[in-house]
């Protein structure tokens, strides 16, 4: 049996956004699980057109968390984000010899859930043990190199 910890969260939705859900998902996958500040920074420099509406929804969810629930904006993390398909507007493009091709103007419903998670301290015991093990390996390799040169010097 697994236990899940419930964190306080806030939601925002943008409906009928004039961007294809497939193209929105390309951008959404970049920011899932990131902090809100990191996600907005990533989207600010993303070249895709879908990054603008996704960034707006994330900013809206962060504002909802701060204003409605009183959560600290520095602890917010994008816990859930997804794009569903909205209605498709159909248009006709006239083609040669009386033909007509259909143009599908797709829309998306973008949903974002942000959670307030406590910040995890970096560089705790794990970082110290990693540095000490690296130092021990370096010391061992230096000793081995000195021993090797010593043995070469003694034989000649």
Curated annotation (Swiss-Prot):
Pfam families: Ribosomal_L22. Part of the 50S ribosomal subunit. Belongs to the universal ribosomal protein uL22 family. HAMAP family: Ribosomal_uL22_B. Residues 114-156 are annotated as: Disordered. This is Large ribosomal subunit protein uL22. The keyword Nucleotide-binding does not apply. PANTHER family: CHLOROPLAST 50S RIBOSOMAL PROTEIN L22-RELATED (PTHR13501), LARGE RIBOSOMAL SUBUNIT PROTEIN UL22M (PTHR13501:SF8). Residues 147-156 have a biased composition (Basic and acidic residues). InterPro entries: Ribosomal_uL22, Ribosomal_uL22_bac/chlpt-type, Ribosomal_uL22_bac/org-type, Ribosomal_uL22_CS, Ribosomal_uL22_sf. GO terms for cellular component: cytosolic large ribosomal subunit. This protein binds specifically to 23S rRNA; its binding is stimulated by other ribosomal proteins, e.g. L4, L17, and L20. It is important during the early stages of 50S assembly. It makes multiple contacts with different domains of the 23S rRNA in the assembled 50S subunit and ribosome. The globular domain of the protein is located near the polypeptide exit tunnel on the outside of the subunit, while an extended beta-hairpin is found that lines the wall of the exit tunnel in the center of the 70S ribosome.
């Amino acid at each position: 049996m697994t236990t899940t910890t419930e964190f306080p969260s806030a939601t925002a939705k943008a409906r009928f956004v004039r961007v294809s859900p497939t193209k929105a998902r390309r951008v959404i996958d970049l920011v899932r699980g990131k902090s809100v500040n990191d996600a907005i920074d990533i989207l600010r420099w993303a070249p895709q057109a879908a990054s603008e509406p996704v960034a707006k929804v994330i900013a809206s969810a962060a504002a909802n968390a701060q204003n409605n629930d009183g959560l600290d904006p520095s602890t917010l993390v994008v816990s859930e984000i997804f794009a569903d398909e909205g209605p498709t507007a159909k248009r006709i493009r006239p083609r040669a010899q009386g033909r007509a091709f259909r143009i599908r103007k797709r829309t998306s419903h973008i949903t974002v859930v942000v959670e307030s998670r406590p910040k995890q301290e970096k560089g705790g015991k794990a970082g110290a043990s990693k540095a000490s093990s690296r130092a021990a390996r370096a010391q061992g390799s230096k000793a081995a190199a000195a021993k090797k040169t010593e043995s070469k010097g003694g034989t000649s």
